[in-house]
């Protein structure tokens, strides 16, 4: 049967772009190009699935010089030569769509099709595809980048003048200059009667008249492809027909569900050839690969900065535009990235989805968890190039580097103070503004830093996460642990520039420096007394208020200072953590150890200005001064008798109470004063520590020695 000779060409509905025009298209326009191509492709395939056809495909890689072949589809009513494998075609349509989406996500150029027409005969077809086998057209690895063009044509020798003219006209177009998205379809009028009822003819007529037959009433947007219309409709209607059977999450596209499922299966099919790292998305692999190549193809037109990811460039551009389109519904704070908004939202919800497998501690950010893990692993990836000191956090390294450079680039506009870090400047500014946005839910106390609130919260919870490996003592603050460790190591990093004396704490150095300067900047408004440190002034003020808010749980005794309660608590526990390296004697407080140490050194740094007498303990000097001033600040409430020492008052009060707390272990005799017990104990031991320098006679009590020395005419001892 002779094939009809009449032809119809669709050249007039072609959508063509030059290379320069193509680069100007935005992603949405390129996606439209893809959808039009696919619609044409499917419509042509669906014309007559039972008909015999032949197809050839190959493509050109972007920037390569491979020969371009055009896929051809031939109706051969009288030739039963091989059958088109339409399932293969549909499979490749799906592969093309998926790969396009991967490339778009990856930031690659969208696929483009370059056209070159071929004419052929059934003889040529017979030679290439003899054997009546299904055609397995070879698409190759580059099919994802280029969709082949389809032609339906009649066998050579039966083509009319119109067909030859159409082909000649088409071949005159420069394929190196044009990129075409069109079905160059040549069909006889007889076949065309059926064809005019297809969606392809409708699409051709719509494009030719610049009309769009699919319009969405919600947005007013029109489309010339039903597939585009359906996709757009899904976005507005919020329809998500693809559901994950594991977690129930819904998606509006099947490919999104396929990507999501890999989260549950752990599948990571894309592997890096360089380092072996695997990824669940091809886009992630491509992005990772740029780390090896150093490629940064995305450039900011404003400042020239380049990026390896398109998303990073888009985020960067908001710096120039100042755009922050993502707003928090809770507090109104705006962000330039949706991820930042999502992260911020956890502040309101309290969500902490990232949990440490070692200690079960939870975090609101993945970066916080990774940073925390280094505590368990001991990893310190940030190393100083000057002194090789390593740090867990990059911020800690940045702080440390300032020691070497002494650079403090961040300056406060209010007071001119400079800082090595911008975060430190921001915290400092709250001093001027008085802003304290962080409030404790337990007691209502407010803080200017979140870290201070977190630290304060441990007072309510009793949490002490920092433990000393030497003595197992625990602390609520890391700085307290580091300070405590110096007791074991003997480290004294704070050195006086005047006398080279070293100290474990910077506060102790500050106290010591006043000895040289004599400065006491902190003054009490009640009594006018001045102090070296603000903490000392705060402690002093309690004397005027009489407040004793620190109570011992063991005996109920109250104290006006927390440190005093801590010292007192050691009476119950028997703890004496401070040991003398000379004689091994242990003490409850560090000050007691320091005083004791002067017995070995003979140091007496405290001198009376009246009589030049020297003392090894400051409190002894203050007590001695009362000899000159006659001051007796401690008064008995019963008989109004006054004393120069609080210990004397305590002893005296036992006269009224009859209390004798000091008991001899040998004979059970009790005494009001500890000194009386000590003197009595020598009766049992026979010890006589007080010896006369004139005659060598020894005595149990110092008072007895003084009385004896009067015989020799020696004056009383001071």
Swiss-Prot record:
May be involved in transcriptional regulation. SMART domains: KRAB, ZnF_C2H2. PROSITE patterns: KRAB (PS50805), ZINC_FINGER_C2H2_1 (PS00028), ZINC_FINGER_C2H2_2 (PS50157). PANTHER family: C2H2-TYPE DOMAIN-CONTAINING PROTEIN-RELATED (PTHR23235:SF178), KRUEPPEL-LIKE TRANSCRIPTION FACTOR (PTHR23235). This is Zinc finger protein 888. GO terms for cellular component: nucleus. It is found in: Nucleus. Belongs to the krueppel C2H2-type zinc-finger protein family. It comes from the Eukaryota. Residues 8-79 form the KRAB domain. The keyword DNA-binding applies. Transmembrane segments: none annotated. One of its GO terms (biological process) is regulation of transcription by RNA polymerase II. Its main location: nucleus. GO terms for molecular function: DNA-binding transcription factor activity, RNA polymerase II-specific; RNA polymerase II cis-regulatory region sequence-specific DNA binding; zinc ion binding. The keyword Transmembrane does not apply. There is a cross-link at residue 204 (Glycyl lysine isopeptide (Lys-Gly) (interchain with G-Cter in SUMO2)). It comes from Homo sapiens. Keywords: DNA-binding, Isopeptide bond, Metal-binding, Nucleus, Repeat, Transcription, Transcription regulation, Ubl conjugation, Zinc, Zinc-finger. SUPFAM superfamilies: beta-beta-alpha zinc fingers (SSF57667), KRAB domain (Kruppel-associated box) (SSF109640). A zinc finger (C2H2-type) spans 214-236, 242-264, 270-292, 298-320, 326-348, 354-376, 382-404, 410-432, 438-460, 466-488, 494-516, 522-544, 550-572, 578-600, 606-628, 634-656, 662-684, 690-712.
């Amino acid at each position: 049967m002779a094939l009809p000779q009449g032809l119809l060409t669709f050249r007039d509905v072609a959508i063509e772009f030059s290379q320069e025009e193509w680069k100007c298209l935005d992603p949405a326009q390129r996606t439209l190009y893809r959808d039009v191509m696919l619609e044409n492709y499917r419509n042509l395939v669906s014309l007559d699935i039972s008909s015999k056809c032949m197809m050839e495909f190959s493509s050109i890689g972007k920037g390569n010089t491979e020969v371009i072949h055009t896929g051809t589809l031939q109706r051969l009513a009288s030739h039963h030569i091989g059958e088109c494998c339409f399932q293969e075609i549909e499979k490749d349509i799906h592969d093309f769509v998926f790969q396009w989406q991967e490339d778009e996500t990856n930031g690659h150029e969208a696929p483009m099709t370059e056209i070159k027409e071929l004419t052929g005969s059934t003889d040529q077809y017979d030679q290439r595809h003899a054997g009546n086998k299904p055609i397995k057209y070879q698409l190759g690895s580059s099919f994802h980048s280029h969709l082949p063009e389809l032609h339906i044509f009649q066998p050579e020798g039966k083509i009319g003048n119109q067909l030859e003219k159409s082909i000649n006209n088409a071949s005159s177009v420069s394929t190196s200059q044009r990129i075409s998205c069109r079905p160059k379809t040549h069909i006889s009028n007889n076949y065309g009667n059926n064809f005019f009822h297809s969606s392809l003819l409708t699409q051709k007529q719509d494009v030719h008249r610049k009309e769009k037959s699919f319009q969405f009433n919600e947005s007013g947007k029109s489309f010339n492809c039903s597939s585009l219309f359906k996709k757009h409709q899904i976005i507005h209607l919020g329809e998500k027909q693809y559901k994950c059977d594991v977690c129930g999450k819904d998606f509006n596209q099947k490919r999104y569900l396929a990507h999501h499922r890999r989260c549950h299966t752990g599948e990571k099919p894309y592997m890096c050839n360089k380092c072996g790292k695997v990824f669940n998305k091809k886009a992630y692999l491509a992005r990772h690969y740029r780390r090896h190549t150093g490629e940064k193809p995305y450039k900011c037109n404003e400042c020239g900065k380049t990026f390896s990811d398109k998303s990073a460039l888009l985020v960067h551009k908001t710096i120039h535009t100042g755009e922050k389109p993502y707003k928090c519904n809770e507090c109104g704070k705006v962000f330039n990235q949706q991820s930042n908004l999502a992260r911020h939202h956890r502040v309101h919800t309290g969500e902490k989805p990232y949990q440490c497998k070692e200690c079960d501690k939870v975090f609101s950010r993945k970066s916080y968890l990774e940073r925390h893990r280094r505590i368990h692993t001991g990893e310190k990836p940030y190393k100083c190039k000057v002194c090789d000191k390593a740090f867990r956090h990059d911020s800690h390294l940045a702080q440390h580097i300032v020691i070497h450079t002494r650079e403090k680039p961040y300056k406060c506009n209010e007071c001119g103070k400079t800082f090595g870090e911008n975060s430190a400047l921001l915290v400092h500014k709250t001093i001027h503004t008085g802003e304290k946005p962080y409030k404790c839910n337990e007691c209502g106390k407010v803080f200017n830093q979140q870290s201070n609130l977190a630290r304060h919260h441990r007072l309510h919870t009793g949490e002490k996460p920092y433990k000393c490996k030497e003595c197992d003592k625990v602390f609520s603050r890391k700085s307290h642990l580091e300070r405590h460790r110096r007791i074991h190591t003997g480290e004294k990093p704070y050195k006086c520039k005047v006398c080279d004396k070293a100290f474990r704490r910077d506060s102790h150095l500050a106290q010591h420096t006043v000895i040289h300067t004599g400065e006491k900047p902190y003054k009490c408004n009640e009594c006018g007394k001045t102090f070296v440190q603000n903490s000392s002034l705060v402690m002093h003020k309690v004397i005027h208020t009489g407040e004793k808010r620190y109570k011992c749980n063991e005996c109920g005794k109250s104290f006006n200072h927390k440190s005093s309660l801590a010292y007192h608590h050691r009476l119950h526990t028997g703890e004496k953590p401070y040991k003398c390296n000379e004689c091994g004697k242990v003490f409850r407080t560090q000050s007691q150890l320091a005083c004791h140490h002067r017995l070995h050194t003979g140091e007496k740094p405290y001198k009376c200005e009246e009589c030049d007498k020297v003392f090894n303990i400051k409190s002894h000097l203050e007590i001695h001064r009362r000899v000159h001033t006659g001051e007796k600040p401690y008064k008995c409430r019963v008989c109004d008798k006054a004393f120069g020492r609080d210990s004397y008052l305590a002893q005296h009060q036992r006269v009224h109470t009859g209390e004798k707390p000091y008991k001899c272990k040998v004979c059970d005799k009790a005494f009001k004063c500890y000194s009386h017990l000590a003197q009595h104990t020598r009766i049992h031991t026979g010890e006589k520590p007080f010896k006369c320098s004139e005659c060598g006679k020894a005595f149990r009590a110092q008072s007895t020695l003084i009385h004896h020395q009067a015989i020799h005419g020696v004056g009383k001892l001071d």
